[in-house]
Amino acid sequence: MARIPECTILLLLCMCVLAVPAQCFNLQPCVLVNETVSVEKEGCPRCLVFRTTICSGHCPTKEPVYKSPFSVVNQHVCTYGNFRYETIRLPDCADGVDPLVTYPVALSCECSLCSMDTSDCTIESVEPDFCMSQRLPVYESQKPSLYDY
């Protein structure tokens, strides 16, 4: 019986792994998710934490084998398709500080280029509910309106 070299077996295993589509790795597609986020502002001593809808998940992407200095690689990210803006009032702000903060709420998601107008396009950022000041929890059903203060 002919002996198969170890490098041939290794090559076959690598080819099998590369041939497996991304769906087999249980990568969540780009979808709407409910997420706890925080808002804070200089001059307001508390960080307001609440739940809202954001986009999260995996987008198919291609990485070229040959990278030319003249080619442009556009990576698609999971971002807002449609959205609306909501405004929330931060409590206990100093005199002269506008207590209103406006933020986007995702209505639909899509895989497209990242827009700095609505998204954090950094490679690695802080968690969405990160606070530098004292946390003031507000839950989805208790989110204050503009007129609660």
UniProtKB/Swiss-Prot annotation:
Heterodimer of an alpha and a beta chain. Keywords: Disulfide bond, Glycoprotein, Hormone, Secreted, Signal. This is Gonadotropin subunit beta-2. InterPro entries: Cystine-knot_cytokine, Glyco_hormone_CN, Gonadotropin_bsu, Gonadotropin_bsu_CS. One of its GO terms (cellular component) is extracellular space. Residues 1-24 form the signal peptide. The keyword Signal applies. Belongs to the glycoprotein hormones subunit beta family. CDD domains: GHB_like (cd00069). Involved in gametogenesis and steroidogenesis. Glycans are attached at N34. It is found in: Secreted. SUPFAM superfamilies: Cystine-knot cytokines. GO terms for molecular function: hormone activity. It comes from Clupea pallasii. Transmembrane segments: none annotated. Disulfide bonds join C30-C78, C44-C93, C47-C131, C55-C109, C59-C111, C114-C121.
